[in-house]
UniProtKB/Swiss-Prot annotation:
One of its GO terms (cellular component) is cytosol. It comes from Burkholderia orbicola (strain MC0-3). The gene is pgi. It catalyses: alpha-D-glucose 6-phosphate = beta-D-fructose 6-phosphate. This is Glucose-6-phosphate isomerase. HAMAP family: G6P_isomerase.
């Protein structure tokens, strides 16, 4: 059966018409919000986190029908198939076993292989952290440069930044992803080649951006005095293609393996996370894995009605497919989680930005929403105006860390107050009558500008303290949310064919930029004109 023919979908359409104009402030009114309160009913713990869903435009019947939709769509079966190592990525004929990277059960798929590679990572990380692994002049490593793009960059960068408070102060970690040379050049201004280790991360070891940066970095080392036969002290590779790593010039002993049954955007738990392990240490890296495993167990064992990834995914579908929301916002009220929104952009949109169903037919309903965000309170002074008073409804995930990870504890009540107040203001709004009172006598014309529609939906995720374990759980929560939505939408969240066409055409355009002339028949007139302008500029 297709999605729109499922009984729960039909029931949700009818229910939506009944509930679409309901007001959150009415549901929270004292005469309606009796024990157990709405907040008590709709706050769910799991995996060391808690989620307050009460400020969403849902009632008990909405959740009942959404959970039934998950059952009708086969969420439980697809979840179990993924954990069992079955082929859940049919377009590439692969399993998706990122969960095996943090499993503790010796019977988990590839357990021995995963454990052996992690032990190799730990030995290397300890050598770098202790100073026993040195550069070619005998100096200890003080800078690590991670070169990768997409999943080989976004996840490790996000985690290293988030866990800065538990990282060693002896080593600075830098991330280079963009093929724009400015990205690498700015990092090279900050480092000494005698004290720098490069981690080159690419599943194929042929990725254009990564290999361009890797070659430039290798040339930089040699130009600054590192003998070519000593580069092994400064380069390691992470790849599913070890032969290509060795061909590049990295010593075979310096190759760490990733596997084709782990997608790039799900890979920070593997050797792709080597920069994380060097920064925070093997023991803390194990805690990161343990937190993800906590959420894995919650996802597998909790009933759907009390299952955080399931509910987060279903509520997202409620807004995307019934309310017609085009985007959703992630607002972590934590500077440590600065890079979480950009990480989630790839996780959500590269996974679920698809139009083809698993059977090859095309969907007739929206799939992935545009995912975006900025840490609080910065966003309040940038785009919250639109969230409060614009005509577009944007569902929001607020993320609040209840205890600070830094010594400036007096800032924290202000941060939390802003987070909670924003969710309350978005829910309550301000009526025209209330606005008239705020405007005051003689300022009737100002009142419409002081109104707030309210009824804007938000979820607040609560993290007691930002530790490797709670961060691991938070990341895994969103990983599993993506699977839930993909299953309901009947799409494959583990491939990314959408990145291919531009890469293919990019090679043609790159060749044309250095050619003597460009055949106008090769491109449309706009692209031809752009190439010609760029050719002229590059010759100057």
């Amino acid at each position: 059966m297709t999605l729109k023919s499922l009984p729960a979908w039909t029931a949700l359409q009818s229910h939506f018409e009944q509930i679409r104009h309901a007001r959150l402030r009415d549901w929270f009114a004292p005469e309606n919000d009796r024990a157990p309160t709405r907040a008590e009913r709709f706050t769910i713990p799991g995996g060391g986190l808690a989620a307050d869903f009460s400020k969403n435009r849902i009632d008990d019947e909405t959740l009942r029908l959404l959970v039934q939709l998950a059952r009708d769509a086969g969420v439980e079966a697809r979840r179990d198939a993924m954990f069992a190592g079955e082929i859940v990525n049919p377009t590439e004929g692969r399993a998706a076993l990122h969960t095996a990277l943090r499993a503790t059960d010796p019977q988990a798929p590839f357990h021995a292989q995963v454990s052996a590679e992690r032990a190799k990572m730990a030995t290397f990380a300890r050598a770098v952290r202790s100073g026993t692994w040195t550069g070619y002049t005998g100096k200890r490593i003080r800078h690590v440069i991670n070169i990768g793009i997409g999943g080989s960059d976004l996840g490790p960068k996000m985690v290293v930044h988030a866990l800065h408070h538990v990282a060693t102060p002896e080593i600075s970690t830098h991330f280079v992803s963009n093929v724009d040379g400015a990205d690498l050049a700015r990092v090279l201004e900050q480092v000494d080649p005698e004290e720098t280790l490069a981690i080159i991360v690419s599943k194929t070891f042929t990725t254009l951006e990564t290999m361009t940066n890797a070659r430039s970095l290798r040339d930089w080392f040699v130009a600054r005095g590192c003998p070519e036969d000593a580069l092994a002290k400064h380069f390691v590779g992470v790849s599913a293609n070890p032969a290509e790593v060795v061909k590049f010039g990295i010593a075979a002993d310096n190759v760490f393996e990733m596997w084709d049954w782990v997608g790039g955007r799900y890979s920070l738990w593997s050797a792709v996370g080597l920069s994380i392990m060097i920064a925070i240490g093997p023991e803390q890296f194990d805690e990161l894995l343990a937190g993800a495993n906590d959420m894995d167990r919650h996802f597998r064992e909790a009933p759907l009605e009390r299952n955080l990834p399931v509910l987060l995914g279903l509520i997202g579908i409620w807004y995307r497919n019934f309310f017609g929301s085009q985007s959703y916002l992630v607002a972590p009220y934590s500077e440590a989680l600065h890079y979480l929104p950009s990480y989630l952009q790839q996780l959500e949109m590269e996974s679920n930005g698809k139009s083809a169903r698993l059977d090859g037919t095309f969907v007739d309903y929206p799939t992935s929403a545009v995912t975006w965000g900025e840490p609080g309170t910065n966003g309040q002074h940038a785009f919250f105006q639109m969230l409060h008073q614009g005509p577009t409804i944007v569902p929001i995930d607020f993320i609040a860390v209840l205890t600070p990870e830094h010594p400036l504890a007096s800032h924290h009540p202000k941060l939390l107050a802003n987070c909670f107040a924003q969710s309350e203001a978005l829910m309550l709004g301000r009526t025209l009558e209330e606005a008239r009172k705020v405007a005051g006598p003689g300022k009737e014309a100002l009142a419409p500008h002081l109104t707030f529609p309210g009824n804007r939906p938000t979820t607040t995720l609560l993290v007691d303290a930002l530790t490797p374990r709670t961060l691991g759980a938070l990341i895994a929560l969103y990983e599993h949310k993506v699977l839930v939505q993909a299953t309901v939408w009947d799409i494959n969240p583990f491939d990314q064919w959408g990145v291919e066409l531009g890469k293919i055409l990019g090679k043609v355009v790159e060749a044309d930029l250095s050619a003597e002339s460009v055949d106008p028949a090769k491109h449309d007139s706009s692209t031809t004109a752009l190439i010609e302008r760029a050719r002229a500029a590059l010759k100057r």
